[in-house]
Amino acid sequence: MSFRAPNLIRSAAGRRASQTLNLRSQVIRRRFATEGGPEITKPSSPRSSNTRYLLAGVGIAAVGAAYYFYGTGRTAHDSANKADTVVRGAVATVEAKTGLRRGKDEYQKVYNRIAETLEKEGYDDGSLAPVLLRLAWHSSGTYNKEDGTGGSNFATMRFKPEAEHSANNGLHVAREHMEKIKQEFPWISYGDLWTLGGVCAVQESGGPTIPWRPGRIDGFEAQVTPDGRLPDASQAQDHLRFIFNRMGFNDQEIVALSGAHAMGRCHTNRSGFEGPWTFSPVTFSNQYFALLRDEPWQWKKWTGPAQYEDKNTKTLMMLPTDMALLKDKSFKKYVDIYADNEEKFFSDFAKAFSKLIELGVPERQWAGEPWTLGTSD
């Protein structure tokens, strides 16, 4: 379908759009600097084909911005935010098409810097890796395949409404830590930074190599997802399937991703639950599955929410959603596989986690196949 306007209207609209886009370009540049939007690094001698892509992308962004500003009946603030999102998406697409995006070596430097800062004396078990893994997981696990909302693309946990979702309690620790990394590498988007932090957390803690690639853009508060999209630890297997199927995961992937509980612990002042899942909560392994299956468990007698404790030491915990993996025949099949075969767990987790942290990102924003980034060893 084509759209045509009388000459007088086109002329007026053109002047108004030109004035607005000049103003918007100033705002957009400021927002790119302060909100982690992608930058274009100008090559010394760009190829003509790259230039054509760049000009086409800028033209598309301008048309989109003008349309959102004038054609949707939104408030000026909402329209401006939408225009910025259109431009950022166009920039990411142009970068992907032209090879203007920063290379693997630049992102390896960010990875290395994160790795250097993982150890933190006095925090939990001496490492920030578990909470960085949780940040990557929770910032991606809001995806809804039905309408394409949520996921890692807009890093909307930066905004108060999503930051205050009960499932995200305590993640201010991870966000504040990663903000320091962001100050050192202001060109990286928050979505790329947070997911890269999760990859680093797993790999530096003895886990598998996670395929990862850049391309996420930062959004606005209007793109915050509704509360309730992340798993509720007090629920059972039907809830797990509802949450994970909404993102596009099957039973095997549900169990594999649950293996992230190999790391970290719960806190009464965050989730209400208390304790670690394993005896080595800063090491990524298949110990979670072995303990879940082989240890005797009982209900913990305390005033907090219902959770399990191991009968032998009473120092470990499992959540109702963890125990659901044993009670459901389909889930338990994979618990047994992963408890007996760490290599298989690592392989399946790497695939599922890489899929998780790419949810919500349009294919056109990727520049190519995922990379594997080296560990600090």
Curated annotation (Swiss-Prot):
The residue ranges crossing the membrane are none
Cofactor binding summary note: Binds 1 heme b (iron(II)-protoporphyrin IX) group per subunit.
Compartments reported by the entry: Mitochondrion matrix; Mitochondrion intermembrane space
Family matches, as InterPro entries: Ccp1-like, Haem_peroxidase, Haem_peroxidase_sf, Peroxidase_I, Peroxidases_AS, Peroxidases_heam-ligand_BS
* Cofactor(s), names only, from the UniProt record: heme b
* Alphabetized PROSITE patterns for the sequence: PEROXIDASE_1 (PS00435), PEROXIDASE_2 (PS00436), PEROXIDASE_4 (PS50873)
Matching CDD domains, A to Z? Answer: ascorbate_peroxidase
**GO function term, MF aspect, one:** metal ion binding
Q: Which reaction does it catalyse?
A: 2 Fe(II)-[cytochrome c] + H2O2 + 2 H(+) = 2 Fe(III)-[cytochrome c] + 2 H2O
Q: How is this protein annotated for GO cellular component?
A: mitochondrial intermembrane space; mitochondrial matrix
Annotated transit peptide: 1-17
| Residue positions binding heme b | H261
E.C. designation(s): 1.11.1.5
List the keywords (alphabetical).
Heme, Iron, Metal-binding, Mitochondrion, Oxidoreductase, Peroxidase, Transit peptide
Active site (record annotation): H138, W277
Please provide the Gene Ontology terms (biological process) for this protein: cellular response to oxidative stress; hydrogen peroxide catabolic process; response to reactive oxygen species
What does this protein do, in the record's words?
Destroys radicals which are normally produced within the cells and which are toxic to biological systems.
Q: What is known about its subunit structure?
A: Forms a one-to-one complex with cytochrome c.
Q: What is stated as this protein's family in its record?
A: Belongs to the peroxidase family. Cytochrome c peroxidase subfamily.
Name of the molecule in the record: Cytochrome c peroxidase, mitochondrial
Q: Say which species the protein is native to.
A: Cryptococcus neoformans var. neoformans serotype D (strain JEC21 / ATCC MYA-565)
